[in-house]
């Protein structure tokens, strides 16, 4: 966000600061308004609005000015800190170079002194008498053994100190890195006090203290003389310094431990004895160097790392070595010159130790400076850590403020998300269940319409068989067609079954074989039959619970095209329980039936037409609707060439009327008017002229014979009368005349007939009782 004067800050930070600034100003304004309690006049509302808008603009300007001044002050502070850090870095670099050159000069002087002492000892030792050497060999071995123990103990202590000093730590690394930037002039006084304190603590031994004080006057001027040379030298890089130190250490080892390999065997023994003393001298020097400054090939170890101050054990060890050296000088002064040289070497090693101690005091001052710089660096690191923690605290405070400001909205948002997820899961499960239910409903509906009704109906349909009597006058081929048929259990009373079938199925036999769907059979008795309706009732007894009574429907409510099922036993028992499906093809059909098989129709059967497959053996079978209720009984089919699926069933309402009388009476009483008739369609021209029939009359019947004292005779009918209408219905032939008369079998009321007599039309009432 650009706020002017080349200051750019993040937009979120700008908004946050602006919000805080405005909040503080608004709070102050509210306090002032609360104190003043000034009333605002309604007439000056427009002016007040303009002033408010102007105040808001001024408020933004004040915020930008305050923010820009704050950022400028922060930039100035940053630049001042950078300048101070660069200045401190330069001071530390110069101090580092000065200390580095001083340390190198001291190490060079020590190396040169070591080489001179070792050459002197060797030359004097080899000039001594061989006999004196042999006489003192045993004593030398004892003393050398003691010296080895002392030197080994001292080496262990030195190695432990070296291990501690050479181990790099994170604090040392930070001290070496940040020491250059933390030196200031104020540290010089502290370094001086530290040097005095360390020198006083490190020289508690009276003997060593006197020697050190006596030698300081000799060594310090030499170091001061070499300061000019050190300052004139060019600073070395870190790899060059490491290489130089490695070469110096190799030279020391070569000068200290190598002697002539071409000497005689007896001299080699003395050299070995001498080597037990020379390593002690070198060990003293190495320990002093190890205390002062550790040089390691590892580049991680800094060459300027100062050692720790001498411990009490080191000082005691030095005192023991000093006492032993004096003891050797007193014991060997009268025997051999070798021991004198050895005491001289020991004395010089003591001087070297004193010089090293003096140098050690100076290095302790450097150590004090290093510790001071380390403390400063630690303070800086602590301040950085505190800044980081403060930043983290700021972030946490921002998050807390954000949560406190918007937690209701966040909770509502989370609740909405959870609610959406739950509702989605619920709706998915509901839709899945709905799809499953739809599939199940579809399967159940399919089973209900096609199979359930069929399975229930099969339990109510039986096979009816009769045996034609041997003396039957009917031809065998015609009688054989009626030997096997079907029946329907329309009523069940306990173990008693009432079965309806066709009259032409039972024939003239009183007993019938009834076979159920489970292949069990019983013998049934014919209660009654009616050839004009082609119906019969058979009574049977069975305790089989699998046989069920069929449900009765209503044939007056049939609909054209209504689906139906036909259940029967075509061709006998082998194919019992056959189910065929179809529809109602026609209603109110009048089907001529030839009962006695004389090729002459005997009766018009009132039926409805179906297109389901019907075969011989289906006669008397059940026709059920989509609800599984009985709506008709199969009665006939048309068996003609090129004619298919034209079958007929007697409506169940007509069946109920017939079977009721057959159960009680065993027969049906029809009215008989006592006449014989001929169809007009069958008359020839002479017969038409004889009865004086008008030419327009094409259909009707001619009375051919009237019984004396019959209903027709009582009604006034005479031979030669032509009947064209009966009971208000057009009369086609004698089958229709019988059908109309039989339809009034229950009421037996008189009916009106329209006749032609002697060519004249007239009406008469025909009595039915």
From Swiss-Prot:
GO molecular function, one term: serine-type endopeptidase activity
Biased composition (Polar residues): 126-137, 247-262, 331-347, 365-390
Transmembrane segments: 410-430
GO cellular component: plasma membrane
GO biological process, any: proteolysis
EC number: 3.4.21.-
One Pfam family hit: PDZ_2
Record Gene3D superfamilies: 2.30.42.10, Trypsin-like serine proteases
Membrane topology according to the record: Single-pass membrane protein
Keyword vocabulary terms for this entry: Cell membrane, Hydrolase, Membrane, Protease, Serine protease, Transmembrane, Transmembrane helix
Disordered: region residues: 1-390
InterPro entries reported in the protein's UniProt record: Chloro_Bact_Ser_Proteases, PDZ, PDZ_sf, Peptidase_S1_PA, Peptidase_S1_PA_chymotrypsin, Peptidase_S1C
Active site: 504, 534, 619
PDZ domain sequence ranges: 680-733
Location relative to the cell: Cell membrane
Bias (Basic residues): 1-20
Family note: Belongs to the peptidase S1C family.
The protein's name in its UniProt record: Serine protease HtrA-like
Organism: Staphylococcus aureus (strain USA300)
Organism ancestry: Bacteria, Bacillati, Bacillota, Bacilli, Bacillales
